[in-house]
Design a protein with these regions (language model features):
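Conserved N-terminal segment of class I S-adenosyl-L-methionine
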Residues: 1-91, 95, 101-105, 118, ...
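Short glycine-centered segments of the SAM/dcSAM-binding site in methyltransferase folds
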Residues: 44, 128-130
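Active-site acidic short loop of glycosyltransferases
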Residues: 96-100, 113, 127
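Short catalytic micro-motifs in class I SAM-dependent methyltransferases
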Residues: 106-110
Length: 204
C-alpha cells in the first residue's frame, strides 16, 4: 500500500480522545519516519510507546514484522492493530537482539527513566540496527504540552506533569552514553509542528 492509497482509503482515522490517546497519526511525520527508517519486508521493527497503534498499522504495509508496545491500558483497549502489545518500554519482554529497527514518536519526553529506556532499546536491537527517536522542540519544558494540559487538567501549568523532560540532541547523546547506541544524526523537522528527529545505530 502506498502512502497516497492509504490516505484515499481512509484507513487511518483519529477520533478525539483524552491525552493518552490523542497522538494518533500524522501523515507528514510518517513520511519523515519512512525516509530515515527505510523499512523492508520481513524486518522486525518495534514501535516503542505506540499508543493505539496507528503507526503500527501503517507500518504493516511495509513489513509483517512490526510490533508496538505501550503501557497505557486505555490506549490498548482502543488499539487499531492486533500487533499492539501491553508492556513497559523500560523493561521489555523481548529477547536480546530481537529487532532489526525501532522507532519512538513523541514518547521519550514522558518517560521517567530515560537511561533505562535507551539501555533496553539497545538490548533488543540487533547489531547495526537503527532507532529513530522523535521528540518535541521546546524553548522550555512543557511548551508543546500546554494545549493538552488545558484540555486534560484545565490548567496550562500542568504541562510539566505531561512532559517530564525538555530534550535536545545533545541531551539524548548524553543519555545514550554507556550503551551500544551511537549517534548518527539529528535534525529539526517540520511535520505539523516543530520536532527533533535523532537517528541512533547499535554498534557491534
Amino acid at each position: 500500500m502506498s502512502l497516497s492509497e492509504g490516505r484515499r482509503s481512509g484507513a487511518l482515522r483519529s477520533p478525539k480522545q483524552s491525552y493518552t490517546m490523542a497522538f494518533n497519526f500524522n501523515w507528514a511525520l510518517f513520511d519523515v519516519l519512512l525516509k530515515y527508517l527505510e523499512p523492508r519486508q520481513g524486518e522486525a521493527i518495534l514501535d516503542l510507546g505506540c499508543s493505539r497503534g496507528f503507526y503500527v498499522r501503517a507500518m504493516e504495509a511495509y513489513t509483517d514484522g512490526v510490533v508496538g508496545v505501550d503501557i497505557s491500558e486505555a490506549s490498548l483497549k482502543g488499539a487499531v492493530s492486533q500487533r499492539v502489545k501491553y508492556g513497559d518500554i523500560t523493561n521489555l519482554e523481548f529477547g536480546d537482539a530481537s529487532f532489526d529497527k525501532a522507532y519512538s514518536l513523541h514518547t521519550v519526553e514522558h518517560i521517567p527513566n530515560l537511561r533505562q529506556f535507551f539501555a533496553e532499546t539497545a538490548r533488543v536491537l540487533k547489531p547495526g540496527g537503527l532507532v529513530i527517536i522523535v521528540y518535541p522542540w521546546e524553548p522550555f519544558r512543557g511548551f508543546q504540552a500546554i494545549v493538552a494540559a488545558i484540555r486534560q487538567y484545565k490548567n496550562p501549568f500542568m504541562a510539566r506533569r505531561i512532559h517530564l523532560h525538555r530534550l535536545t540532541p545533545v541531551g539524548v547523546a548524553r543519555l545514550t552514553e554507556g550503551t551500544s547506541l551511537a549517534h548518527v544524526k539529528s535534525k529539526l523537522v517540520l511535520a505539523l509542528g516543530i520536532q527533533y528527529l535523532t537517528v541512533l545505530c547499535k554498534e557491534g
